[in-house]
Amino acid sequence: MHTVDEISECPKTLLLTGASRGIGHATVKRFSAAGWRVITISRQPFSEKCPWAHGKENHLQMDLADPGQIEQGLRELKRRLPESKLHALVNNAGISPKMPDGSRMDTIHTDLKIWWHVFSVNLFSTIALARGLFEELSAAGGTIINVTSIAGKRVHPFAGPAYATSKAALGALTRELANEFAPLGIRVNAVSPGEVATSILSPGTEALVESSVPMKRLGTIGEVAEVIFFLCSEAASYVTGAEIPIDGGQQVR
């Protein structure tokens, strides 16, 4: 049985950053299956490995670390929005730099240029998109979803301080935007994934799950996508300012 959002006056429009793999990939598939039109943004050209309809013509190639490219991309995006309405913005793109051996980068060994790049992609691009699209979101009674991380709330063995602090800041930004944008009819929430099964898992993940996750398993990208879809649906019409953990109870340990 389909939900109200799946059988109403579709297509609604979703803009999602970071769609080529993992959580973003699963989220596009979930919304596409519900009849939404999905516009994707990434630094790379559209990948033919992305199996959703009209994906190539609904893709914008943009470096989210470059304010000039964001400004230019916003102009192009606005031309593509029917009736100047955007129903959902999902800020999923994120980078987590590692040392050459794959270990986490600590504060001392992370050059300030890397910090700036991480914050540009993980935080500042979110601000730029929210500022640039609030009118289109307001016109649709839309919603913003920010993808944070459990690393934004606790020291994580695989995520370094640049990534962790950018995600903590994104959680704070979610609350600020929820407060500012509520009078505009825009809801703003976040999802905070824990250990999620992806194509590349850090060594030691299984041991971390066993010791730190009460449910004793990895989450799936589909489970994260379902929560994102819920937050963009009428079922969550009175939910704003929330940061929902999707971590099998990891945050309680």
What role is predicted for each listed range?
Residues 2-5, 154, 207, 229, ...:
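Short C-terminal tail/terminal secondary-structure segment
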Residues 20-21:
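Conserved glycine-rich cofactor-binding loop
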Residues 99-116, 209:
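Substrate-binding pocket helix/loop in short-chain dehydrogenase/reductase
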Residues 130, 166, 174:
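Active-site helix of classical SDR
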Residues 135, 179-180, 237:
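Alpha-helical segment proximal to the catalytic Tyr-Lys
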Residues 149:
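Residue(s) in the substrate-gating loop at a strand-loop-helix junction
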Residues 182, 187, 239-241:
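Short, small/polar-rich loop/turn modules that mediate ligand/substrate recognition or access, typified
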